[in-house]
From Swiss-Prot:
This is Two pore channel protein 1. It comes from Homo sapiens. Residues 769-796 form a coiled coil. Each of the two internal repeats contains five hydrophobic transmembrane segments (S1, S2, S3, S5, S6) and one positively charged transmembrane segment (S4). S4 segments represent the voltage-sensor and are characterized by a series of positively charged amino acids at every third position. Changing residue 273 to P: Loss of NAADP-mediated cytoplasmic calcium release. Keywords: Calcium, Calcium channel, Calcium transport, Coiled coil, Endosome, Glycoprotein, Ion channel, Ion transport, Lysosome, Membrane, Repeat, Transmembrane, Transmembrane helix, Transport, Voltage-gated channel. One of its GO terms (molecular function) is phosphatidylinositol-3,5-bisphosphate binding. Residues 134, 199-200, 256-262, 287-294, 466-479, 527-534, 595-629, 654-670 are extracellular.
Amino acid sequence: MAVSLDDDVPLILTLDEGGSAPLAPSNGLGQEELPSKNGGSYAIHDSQAPSLSSGGESSPSSPAHNWEMNYQEAAIYLQEGENNDKFFTHPKDAKALAAYLFAHNHLFYLMELATALLLLLLSLCEAPAVPALRLGIYVHATLELFALMVVVFELCMKLRWLGLHTFIRHKRTMVKTSVLVVQFVEAIVVLVRQMSHVRVTRALRCIFLVDCRYCGGVRRNLRQIFQSLPPFMDILLLLLFFMIIFAILGFYLFSPNPSDPYFSTLENSIVSLFVLLTTANFPDVMMPSYSRNPWSCVFFIVYLSIELYFIMNLLLAVVFDTFNDIEKRKFKSLLLHKRTAIQHAYRLLISQRRPAGISYRQFEGLMRFYKPRMSARERYLTFKALNQNNTPLLSLKDFYDIYEVAALKWKAKKNREHWFDELPRTALLIFKGINILVKSKAFQYFMYLVVAVNGVWILVETFMLKGGNFFSKHVPWSYLVFLTIYGVELFLKVAGLGPVEYLSSGWNLFDFSVTVFAFLGLLALALNMEPFYFIVVLRPLQLLRLFKLKERYRNVLDTMFELLPRMASLGLTLLIFYYSFAIVGMEFFCGIVFPNCCNTSTVADAYRWRNHTVGNRTVVEEGYYYLNNFDNILNSFVTLFELTVVNNWYIIMEGVTSQTSHWSRLYFMTFYIVTMVVMTIIVAFILEAFVFRMNYSRKNQDSEVDGGITLEKEISKEELVAVLELYREARGASSDVTRLLETLSQMERYQQHSMVFLGRRSRTKSDLSLKMYQEEIQEWYEEHAREQEQQRQLSSSAAPAAQQPPGSRQRSQTVT
């Protein structure tokens, strides 16, 4: 494919800072090559990389400057499509661009994250503080004001970038601004009074963390939780309706029994049945009535059958169905959003001389801004991979794959099949035999047998251990035998496959890690290093290798590994809810729970602490539930986790209620409902991921789901010379052409006319979804095209009514 070196003019031009149209280039171009009248709206005066068509600095009126502006704007559009940013937040002038670039770099993201974490961690030092971390009021209030000032600076940069109108339209930013104002007022009041007051609004500090760029997964989770709420609330109301009906019925049936405290009042009936829904008080809640009338058990059996086994499972089914629909709609929305972003970028990259596609010159300019760390060789390989028709220009159809292809990592394909192919014949035969051995089924099943025997041996050894010191000062012979076998296996695989191929497998990395830890455990036993004895306990991890034997187990484990990043964001989402409830709990319930605090309640024994003499010794009877308190943020987190597990959670609730009022139960019940929502979403997410993978495997039985995506491209020597000549004419010697020079020198050294490169990347769920919904995707594209055509007609009909100044255009007119 030839590389064009001639100059051209952008079909769409952006404006300079003053808002005027750029001057026509004085290069002898004809009228058809002059800039069009529908140019852009801002200029870029701080471009770090000059255009390929210029040897150095270019004036604002030159074609090179116009291209540089278009390159950066096109790159911004691609980033907005990738990050799912709305196009109405696109920078509209030079000042907005400067603020946009400042707000979209990792230093700014780290500043956002550090500020949010500082505000959250201040709860460790503010009253009620963790004893070891307590700070003076002046110190923590000053730190809070400093962090809030940083947030003000962040919002000012966003205001400069977005403009006042767009800033007000951005809901999350307005919520963050409102919380910032409240936090500012409270911090100043604390600093002036030198005294902390009730600050429930500290629970809203989480918004600063949620708004961070690095917490995009948390924002998606929260959005899905809110989107799943309508059907969830419908089933929840049905659940509460039956609960109230049964509470009224239970009150009339069991309140005459004076020994039954669970149904003495209607309030107690509702609370008892709410707790019964979690099974935390069963069968205790049934026993007083059951002792008087055995038929009373029917009431509780029917209630649990309806509420726990039917409605709760119905709740999960409804949320799962809603979650599936949300995931599909989210994929469709993001897919069309990316497609629109690509169309915006494409319109900025085509030229007046070549409106049919993007030349390599324009593509290279785009990639300098979109992927600045990508080398010149990788840019050209990306262009080649996109160019399906092998023509000098990229069509819009080819350019639609930019996100998938730009993520590939390129490496030269080795001519030899194995790492040892160039060794002397004797060594080659030895290593080839080892390669055949480690790839054979017999070797693999032998290692599975060794792992199984090792597991049984560890189990027998554990059964034979008695209490006390579990670690002998002498190294067991079985440990040496199995570790030797694993070490030999590791050596054979590295020798037969080569270090690179060996470490490219996730299972091999796991085997290597477990073997290394087993060796460290051997050293800990041999050298009597007691603090490191815990490493020995990791030996049973080898048993996980047995899961590779069955395909279903492999699918489960692969799904689990795929879910880990998303599960981390879901865990962080749950921690955010924990933080908010912990702050509220500290403000209302701090210091009210202590030993012997609840002697008048039904759970007094759980909080009782007393000692008495039995014979000649003193016996201490201690109820440990007083440790479940809200005296500081750490204790609150532990207490909330115990409430999440729900075992005996009502004891904590009743202990707090006995010291405050019955309204305190609303806090605990609300927390249970919120955690039930989050946990249901987590379960629905796991089910959706597993079911999706199973359906994909059934639909695409011949495809390799786990192999990742690989693309192969060949570069000829003539192409390399042309690309290098292009770079020399444009910028002279440049560091990003080093790999191109290395490739060319390698071709000359081995007298090759071409070289093959492999592009690899891991397969994402988006890739699986593209294949899973490929029939529907074409319908989505057609529907999207019809909507764009309708918008284009509306824009053209409204154009005469509102005359635009010459050379100006709105963002929405870039691509309709």
